[in-house]
Amino acid sequence: MLKVDIVTPKGIVYTEEVESVNIPAYDGEMGILENHMLLLTQIKPGLVYFNKDDKNGIAVGYGFADITPDKVIILTEEAVPVGNIDLEEYKKVFEEATRKLSDARTAEEISEWQKKREMAETFINIAKHFSPKIKA
């Protein structure tokens, strides 16, 4: 078994022992099993899911995954279980980021608002994908 912890600045969002975990690494989705080699990797907004069950995953923002043979610690700005994503909230974040991006002057401002918009868009898409009641 593999222990997985997902941690945000607000605290621990998930802690459980699983057989496998899939994470949204920058180079693509990464599947991790017990006895994985040591690795520290950057993650991007996407879905973390366990034991090949993507319906019960957790949407995460930017962060890092610290992988050891028996543990995965995901440190991320934001993490929300798929069923708890507030679609309206993330639509507002997306709209605000789009407005702010058009007014951004510095490379730092552009990068900040691009990241916020990408994370909001990813959370919106995850919510729509896993909730058939939500229309695109």
Curated annotation (Swiss-Prot):
Single Gene Ontology MF annotation: ATP binding
Principal location class: membrane
Name of one Pfam family that matches: ATP-synt_DE_N
Sorted UniProt keywords: ATP synthesis, Cell inner membrane, Cell membrane, CF(1), Hydrogen ion transport, Ion transport, Membrane, Transport
Membrane topology: Peripheral membrane protein
One CC-aspect GO term: proton-transporting ATP synthase complex
InterPro entries reported in the protein's UniProt record: ATP_synth_F1_dsu/esu, ATP_synth_F1_dsu/esu_N, ATPsynth_dsu/esu_N
Localization (cell): Cell inner membrane
NCBIfam families documented for this protein: ATP_synt_epsi
Free-text function comment from the UniProt entry: Produces ATP from ADP in the presence of a proton gradient across the membrane.
Family: Belongs to the ATPase epsilon chain family.
Assembly description: F-type ATPases have 2 components, CF(1) - the catalytic core - and CF(0) - the membrane proton channel. CF(1) has five subunits: alpha(3), beta(3), gamma(1), delta(1), epsilon(1). CF(0) has three main subunits: a, b and c.
Protein's name according to its UniProt entry: ATP synthase epsilon chain
Species of origin: Hydrogenobaculum sp. (strain Y04AAS1)
Gene: atpC
